[in-house]
């Protein structure tokens, strides 16, 4: 998810590292961009904001945006996906599972300079059956992110624990809810170094249906999720940086399409998925007394993969592409193994 919109222009521009010769001309350019729709913005004017901010300001903005994407949204989306893909038959058994997901991303915006990010997320979970209609579970998430900013670098380490419950209203409909909390440790490296910590909370509600037509399975789902990342204050060289808390409300809609067939004792289930995330939330970064705003962006995600079931073991492999207004390349791949008992 992208966290900065082209039409959102910061209240002021930090020029501590790069001083244009004519400040009046710069402010006129920024004002002109704010009054024009995206399609009408000249490329040279749209680039003025990103080019004008200092290295420290650019790094703080980029880190805030990357944290919103990977911490608030990726973790919640992966949990929603796990809950949605649990079948009614799974509710009659207990299971343990582990998944590993790799993300590769490139970001660009008129308010921060282009950067790339690599992230690895590992999740360990347990699902327990309480009755033929009720299932509960717990998920522990650990992720490590490496960012390459313009003349700077960043690193995030994130740990979060979630609990969920899923109730089947009948053979098709289900409702599920989850809640979790976590901790984010961050490091920024320009010519100076800064270390700081933030906390996270998440909660979500999902409603879905499983339609079975012979060997075909169609699983539509919809939900709402609230995610919050706390504020942070830190020093980056001579600059005092204040990052406001970021709260994101997400409306989700997803559709999974699968076909199940057998090859001997092995069950094969190819799977295609599409999901839409409507994200609402704004945050801010203050560097040296000058404020810059950013906001959550809507996303679409498309996935393809397959599940292999042999006795009580399931292996899932899938790849995804995520699109948004300012997402250049967003690709991920996941492998997941589950054991039922």
Task: State what each model feature region is.
Residues 1-124, 132:
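Outer-membrane translocation/initiation segment of Type V secreted surface proteins
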Residues 43, 51, 55, 93-95, ...:
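Membrane translocator/pore-forming domains, dominated by Gram-negative outer-membrane beta-barrels
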